[in-house]
Amino acid sequence: MSIGLTEFVTNKLAAEHPQVIPISVFIAILCLCLVIGHLLEENRWVNESITAILVGAASGTVILLISKGKSSHILVFDEELFFIYLLPPIIFNAGFQVKKKKFFHNFLTIMSFGVIGVFISTVIISFGTWWLFPKLGFKGLSARDYLAIGTIFSSTDTVCTLQILHQDETPLLYSLVFGEGVVNDATSVVLFNAVQKIQFESLTGWTALQVFGNFLYLFSTSTLLGIGVGLITSFVLKTLYFGRHSTTRELAIMVLMAYLSYMLAELFSLSGILTVFFCGVLMSHYASYNVTESSRITSRHVFAMLSFIAETFIFLYVGTDALDFTKWKTSSLSFGGTLGVSGVITALVLLGRAAFVFPLSVLTNFMNRHTERNESITFKHQVIIWWAGLMRGAVSIALAFKQFTYSGVTLDPVNAAMVTNTTIVVLFTTLVFGFLTKPLVNYLLPQDASHNTGNRGKRTEPGSPKEDATLPLLSFDESASTNFNRAKDSISLLMEQPVYTIHRYWRKFDDTYMRPIFGGPRRENQPEC
């Protein structure tokens, strides 16, 4: 009697609220994943993303058995869900929590890895798949598909490595891996969108320039939009001072304006990732000093919590999607063909990553040879940077679904094959490379070496000229010759130490003009960030 009543209530609830049961189940599994991840915190081989994937795969297996092989999914994947609801908190938190001093000290290196590196990787993967796929009997992809594949598999997921590295012990390495991860994702999505605008029916010699032009337009306008929203938020919080009456309001303003920046970028067909990242950086630099101490602490925990839940949610879905038999049956490839295509993609990912990490690292060391900062990228660091970018994650999955499915569903055998191969590559790189990350980092950077590296990273810059950061760039109270000599010395310094010089003059401009308007303590009172 009780069983019949329970079944009746369950069926009635499912009929009236069809999303209640799957959402409840997924949230319960999400909680289970958090508990298991906590228990495995000290495990040498497993990290949070691997835990989420394994729990997702186990959940998918149970659902597959309960549904008698019909489905392994709790929820149906929708790339709009990913791009609109899950990705913004992850990217914003990355910008909000970034150690700005190290990030901008290494800005040129990070941008070279995250932008130039993506272009190099995309070219290698696109042409490699175009050449090798037909040799494996996998045909039917268009030129747009091959270019999209290059951008899809150029997007990295550095979460596994960042969970192992410590930014206080290896500040340079952590800054490069973290910064490149964010810029890489943004560049991959921007380049993916630029590829979609190519008119392949009328290709000319200007097509490559058009793609590059579209990329520059999206990159620059998205960045400016994020900076603009961040500055507006900071100005509003400083001027109105919501904390006088309600700390809840000022926290709500920060959350809503951050999300608004992303939605505005999507509305204007820009890159929401870049916009919300730089909005987070600007809010952290200015807005967080215009709120009460309690709101400042709460905001950091809230943004970190939302990011953590979104990341876990995504990896859980990747685990359940691996058992989607519908796509496996629809795929045009046999089991051996699938392994061959996945192997080719993985090999090209390894090659494409190595093709820019090591040469650009050598170039960076050469350009910084006069800085006397003792922060050259050693060969061991280069290996870790290369390894950190081998794992593929949520952005690759979302872009693959966007390119090869319609609302997560495809009946085309070639498209289904690409979705399944993307899932395989993401699972393989995350699980296998993720399992090996901790032993590799511990081998290359023993604990005593890590501490020494950290101490080097905390040293001051002995060769850097000392100058009062509060002095104006030019003074009308001094003679023309004094100003001229100062400008000449500054130009010489710019040629020898470009990054340091730009950073020093930015600090002057920031203290003199920006902070009085948008908030934040004076430089001498600001803790290192």
From Swiss-Prot:
A Pfam short name: Na_H_Exchanger
Membrane side Vacuolar: residue ranges: 41-45, 134-171, 236-250, 292-301, 364-380, 437-529
Intramembrane segments: 74-94
Predominant place of localization: membrane
Segments crossing the lipid bilayer: 20-40, 46-66, 113-133, 172-192, 215-235, 251-267, 274-291, 302-322, 343-363, 381-401, 416-436
Glycan-bearing residues: N374
Membrane topology reported for the UniProt record: Multi-pass membrane protein
Cellular component per GO, a single term: vacuolar membrane
Entries under NCBIfam families matching the protein: b_cpa1
Cited function: May act in low affinity electroneutral exchange of protons for cations such as Na(+) or K(+) across membranes. May also exchange Li(+) and Cs(+) with a lower affinity.
Protein name: Sodium/hydrogen exchanger 4
The organism of origin for this protein: Arabidopsis thaliana
Phylogenetic placement of the source organism: Eukaryota, Viridiplantae, Streptophyta, Embryophyta, Tracheophyta
